[in-house]
Amino acid sequence: MGQQRAGNRVSELHGCLYVVGGFDDNSLSSVERYDPQSNKWDHVAALTTPRGGEGIETVMGKIFAVGGHNGNAYLNTVEAFDPVLNR
């Protein structure tokens, strides 16, 4: 991983691992993808809202981040990442 983080979540999609959000000293919006075939990490599109401790699930080819905490308040929002569109 390129960024140290805790309280993040991980989901698998198309054979890659996606590490989503979390905290360093602040809540994070960054998302990193690990490809075990090439043993390489890449940054992909960031979350709109920084969050850690979120629920995460892969459904119908997209990764959904649900709730979590942004460092100031608990969140009741949902974001979806589409790897084909990288957003």
Tell me what each language-model feature is.
Residues 1-87:
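Kelch-like beta-propeller repeat domains
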